[in-house]
C-alpha cells in the first residue's frame, strides 16, 4: 500500500505539563480543529475524549497516555497526551522515548511548576525539541512574560516569545504574531475564528522590541543569517520561519506562544507552530541500535530499511484483548505478518494493526516508518522490547529504564474464590505498567503490590474492581526498604551432605563488592573446570533468589557485584540445587563481613503554600528529616519549597498539610534515590521486621 503522507510531513508530538495546566483540554481543542471530534468534552465535566479510563474521567486527571492521529494543513500529527501527576511519570518517560517533538503547556499564572521540571528533565534526556504554550491567559494573575522568564530561570532553558498577548487575565483578547508582525483578535467561539486587526498602538513598541529579540536569538544558530542581521537586512517571513525551525531543532531554543484553550483562543496558532517548527522523523538523529556485543548501528527513518520498531506501551483493551503500541523507526509493517522480538529472541505474529484515537480505533493494513500504531496478537512482547523484520540482521534498540517501586501494600480478595481472578488481573496490569510490581511474600503468603505512590496503587486496586471484577482489601502502605553492602569480602559457601544414598555437593568461593547504582552484576571467573559450566547459572540464580529476600531484615538487596572465582565439585553428588544452596549460603554468611546496611527511599517533595504558613511548614519538614533544597516566592504570592525527605516520614502528609495551611497548601512527591538509613532508625526497623518474620514462621 502506497504511503499516504511523506515522512517529512509527519509530526510525532507529546503534550506534557504539570497537573492542571490544561494539557488534556488543549489536546481536545487540537482534535476539534483538526476535524477529529465534533463536540468538545471538558476535563472538569469528566467528558474528555483523551481521558477515556473511568478513573480518569472521575478524577479529572490523565493517567495513561492516550494516542491519536490528526491532520493539519497537509501534515499528519500523531499526538500523545501524557499525565502530569508524578505517580505516572513512567507514562511520560515512555512517550518521550518514541516522540520527535513536544508541546510543554504552562499555566500562565504559575509558570514553571514542580512537575514541569520533571517532564522537562525527561525531555532533555531524550533531546526532544519543544514548543512552549502558555495556557490560561484569561486566568487571574496570568502573566505571559513572567511565565517565559520562569522557563529561563527555573529550567535554565532559552525560551523566546514568538507571540505577545493582547491583554491578559479577563481582558485577554488575542495575540500579536511576531513572525508575521500581524495581530489577531478571537471571538471565543469553538471554531476559534480570528480576525486580523491593526497591532494595538500601546503594543507596537513592545512588539518591535520582542521581534528584534527573536531575530537576534535565532541568528546565533546560523552564521549567514547573523551577517544579514548585523548588516541591518530585515528577514523575509520564510527566512525567519526557517531560522526558528533550525534553532528549535537543536533542542536548545524553545519558541513560546500563548492562549487559553478553554476559551478557544490561540490553539490554532499553536498547531501552526507545531507544524512549522517541530521536527519530522527526518529532522532528528537516526535511532541508535546495538548489533552483537559492541557494535552500534543507526536505524535510518525510511521505508526501504528492514522493519524496526519499539514496543513502548502494552495495555488491555476490553474488546480486542492485549494492545501493543509500536513506534516504527524504519521499514513497513503489515497485518498478519511475522516479526522477531530481538530483545527476547522470540517470533511474534501481528494479528491486526490499529490506528488509535483515545479509546476508539480504525483498522489499517500497513504501517510505515514514522507511524505510531497499536498491534493486536502479540503474546510475549513487553514495554521496551525491540521488534524487527523476521529475517533482518539482529539489532536491539536502546532500552527504556524505569524506576523501582517505592511503596507497597498487602492485598487480599474479599472472597477466596477470587484468588485466581486476582492473580490474572494483577498479571495483566503488571504487563501494562513497568513501575508496578506484584509478588507473593514467601513468609506470609500475602499478595503484595508495589508502585510509585499511593495514588498509583489506589488506581491499580480500582482497576482490579472495574476491569477484572475483583474486590480486594488493602493493607496500610509500607515503605519498600532495600539492603546493600558497603565493603568487599571473599566468602566461601558450602552445601555438602554425603551420608548414605545420593549425596549433595556444592562448593563456591565468591567475592562480594559494592556496585553503586549499577544493580546486580555477576561475573564468572572460574578457570580450569573447577566448577562445571552447567552449574554457573544455578549459582547466579541462587544469589538472585537470596538477594530477593535479603540477609539483614528480609528486604530485597541492590547494587552488588558478585565474582565467582573458585570452588570444587563432586562427580556424582554435585547438582544444580546443591550449587544454588551453596551460593545462597555464601551470601547469608557474608552479612557481617560486607557491612550490610538498610537503605530507605528518599523522595523529592515540592510543597506549594501561601506565604503566611511558610514558617510552620518549613519547621514541619525539618521534623520529618527533610533537607530543604530550594525555596522560591512565586508571582502569585505562594512559596514553593523543594526538599528531599524520607518516604517513611511522608505518610499522612496530605492531611497534615491541609490542617497546617487551612486547606490552602498542596504538594507533589516523587522518588529521588535510595540512601543509607540512620543507624538508630535502621536498628528499630530491623528489630520490628525480624520480630514480624519470626511471628510469621
From Swiss-Prot:
Catalyzes the GTP-dependent ribosomal translocation step during translation elongation. During this step, the ribosome changes from the pre-translocational (PRE) to the post-translocational (POST) state as the newly formed A-site-bound peptidyl-tRNA and P-site-bound deacylated tRNA move to the P and E sites, respectively. Catalyzes the coordinated movement of the two tRNA molecules, the mRNA and conformational changes in the ribosome. One of its GO terms (biological process) is ribosome disassembly. It comes from Mycoplasmopsis agalactiae (strain NCTC 10123 / CIP 59.7 / PG2). This is Elongation factor G. It is found in: Cytoplasm. SUPFAM superfamilies: EF-G C-terminal domain-like, P-loop containing nucleoside triphosphate hydrolases, Ribosomal protein S5 domain 2-like, Translation proteins. GTP binds at residues 17-24, 81-85, 135-138. Signal peptide: none annotated. PROSITE patterns: G_TR_1, G_TR_2. The keyword rRNA processing does not apply. Its main location: cytoplasm. Keywords: Cytoplasm, Elongation factor, GTP-binding, Nucleotide-binding, Protein biosynthesis. Residues 8-282 form the tr-type G domain. The keyword Protein biosynthesis applies. InterPro entries: EF-G-like_DII, EFG_II, EFG_III, EFG_III/V, EFG_IV, EFG_V, EFG_V-like, G_TR_CS. GO terms for molecular function: GTP binding; GTPase activity; translation elongation factor activity. PANTHER family: RIBOSOME-RELEASING FACTOR 2, MITOCHONDRIAL, TRANSLATION ELONGATION FACTOR G-RELATED. One of its GO terms (cellular component) is cytoplasm. Belongs to the TRAFAC class translation factor GTPase superfamily. Classic translation factor GTPase family. EF-G/EF-2 subfamily.
Amino acid at each position: 500500500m502506497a504511503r499516504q503522507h511523506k515522512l517529512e510531513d509527519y509530526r510525532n508530538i507529546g503534550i506534557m505539563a504539570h497537573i492542571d495546566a490544561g494539557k488534556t483540554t488543549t489536546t481536545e481543542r487540537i482534535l476539534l480543529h483538526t476535524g477529529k471530534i465534533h463536540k468538545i468534552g471538558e476535563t472538569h465535566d469528566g467528558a474528555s475524549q483523551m481521558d477515556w479510563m473511568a478513573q480518569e474521567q472521575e478524577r479529572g486527571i490523565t493517567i495513561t497516555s492516550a494516542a491519536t492521529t490528526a491532520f493539519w494543513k497537509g501534515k499528519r500529527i500523531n499526538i500523545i497526551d501524557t499525565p502530569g501527576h508524578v505517580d505516572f511519570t513512567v507514562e511520560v518517560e515512555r512517550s518521550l522515548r518514541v516522540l520527535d517533538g513536544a508541546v510543554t503547556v504552562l499555566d500562565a499564572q504559575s509558570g514553571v511548576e514542580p512537575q514541569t521540571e520533571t517532564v522537562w528533565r525527561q525531555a532533555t534526556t531524550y533531546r526532544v525539541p519543544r514548543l512552549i504554550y502558555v495556557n490560561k491567559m484569561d486566568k487571574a494573575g496570568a502573566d505571559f512574560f513572567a511565565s517565559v522568564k520562569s522557563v529561563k530561570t527555573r529550567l535554565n532553558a532559552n525560551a523566546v516569545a514568538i507571540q505577545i498577548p493582547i491583554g491578559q487575565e479577563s481582558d485577554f483578547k488575542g495575540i500579536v504574531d511576531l513572525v508575521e508582525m500581524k495581530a489577531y483578535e478571537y471571538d471565543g467561539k469553538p471554531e476559534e475564528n480570528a480576525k486580523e486587526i491593526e497591532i494595538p498602538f500601546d503594543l507596537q513598541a513592545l512588539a518591535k522590541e520582542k521581534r528584534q529579540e527573536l531575530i537576534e536569538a535565532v541568528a546565533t544558530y546560523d552564521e549567514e543569517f547573523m551577517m544579514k542581521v548585523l548588516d541591518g537586512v530585515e528577514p523575509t517571513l520564510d527566512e525567519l520561519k526557517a531560522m526558528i525551525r533550525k534553532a528549535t531543532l537543536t533542542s536548545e531554543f524553545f519558541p513560546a506562544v500563548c492562549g487559553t484553550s478553554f476559551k478557544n483562543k490561540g490553539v490554532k496558532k499553536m498547531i501552526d507552530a507545531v507544524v512549522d517548527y517541530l521536527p519530522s522523523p527526518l529532522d532528528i538523529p537516526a535511532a541508535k541500535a546495538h548489533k552483537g556485543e559492541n557494535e552500534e548501528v543507526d536505524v535510518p527513518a525510511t521505508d526501504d530499511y528492514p522493519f524496526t520498531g519499539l514496543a513502548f506501551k502494552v495495555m488491555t483493551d476490553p474488546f480486542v484483548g492485549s494492545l501493543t503500541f509500536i513506534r516504527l523507526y524504519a521499514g513497513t509493517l503489515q497485518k498478519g505478518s511475522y516479526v522477531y522480538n530481538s530483545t527476547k529472541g522470540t517470533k511474534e505474529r501481528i494479528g491486526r494493526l490499529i490506528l488509535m484515537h483515545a479509546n476508539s480505533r480504525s483498522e489499517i493494513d500497513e504501517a510505515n516508518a514514522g507511524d505510531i500504531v497499536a498491534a493486536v496478537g502479540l503474546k510475549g512482547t513487553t514495554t521496551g522490547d525491540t521488534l524487527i523484520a523476521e529475517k533482518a540482521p539482529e539489532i536491539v534498540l536502546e532500552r527504556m529504564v524505569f524506576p523501582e517501586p517505592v511503596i507497597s501494600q498487602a492485598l487480599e480478595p474479599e472472597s477466596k474464590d477470587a484468588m485466581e481472578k486476582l492473580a490474572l488481573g494483577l498479571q495483566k496490569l503488571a504487563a501494562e505498567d513497568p513501575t508496578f510490581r506484584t509478588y507473593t511474600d514467601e513468609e506470609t503468603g500475602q499478595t503484595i503490590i508495589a508502585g510509585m505512590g499511593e495514588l498509583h496503587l489506589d488506581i491499580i486496586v480500582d482497576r482490579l474492581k472495574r476491569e477484572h471484577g475483583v474486590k480486594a482489601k488493602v493493607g496500610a502502605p509500607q515503605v519498600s526498604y532495600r539492603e546493600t553492602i558497603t565493603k568487599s569480602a571473599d566468602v566461601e559457601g558450602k552445601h555438602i551432605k554425603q551420608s548414605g544414598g545420593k549425596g549433595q555437593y556444592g562448593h563456591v568461593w565468591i567475592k562480594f563488592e559494592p556496585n553503586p547504582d549499577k544493580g546486580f552484576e555477576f561475573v564468572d571467573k572460574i578457570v580450569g573446570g573447577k566448577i562445571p559450566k552447567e552449574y554457573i547459572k544455578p549459582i547466579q540464580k541462587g544469589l538472585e533468589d537470596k538477594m530477593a529476600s535479603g540477609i539483614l531484615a528480609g528486604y530485597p538487596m541492590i547494587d552488588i557485584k558478585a565474582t565467582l572465582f573458585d570452588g570444587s565439585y563432586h562427580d556424582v553428588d554435585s547438582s544444580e540445587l546443591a550449587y544454588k544452596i551453596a551460593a545462597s549460603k555464601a551470601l547469608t554468611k557474608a552479612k557481617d563481613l560486607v557491612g550490610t546496611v538498610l537503605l530507605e527511599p528518599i523522595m523529592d517533595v515540592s510543597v506549594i503554600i501561601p506565604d503566611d504558613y511558610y514558617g510552620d511548614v518549613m519547621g514541619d519538614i525539618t521534623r520529618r528529616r527533610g533537607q530543604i533544597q530550594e525555596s522560591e516566592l512565586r508571582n502569585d504570592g505562594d512559596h514553593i519549597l523543594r526538599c528531599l525527605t524520607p518516604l517513611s516520614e511522608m505518610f499522612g502528609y496530605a492531611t497534615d498539610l491541609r490542617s497546617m495551611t487551612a486547606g490552602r497548601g498542596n504538594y507533589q512527591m516523587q522518588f529521588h534515590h535510595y540512601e543509607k538509613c540512620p543507624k538508630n532508625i535502621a536498628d528499630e526497623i530491623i528489630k520490628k521486621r525480624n520480630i514480624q518474620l519470626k511471628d510469621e514462621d
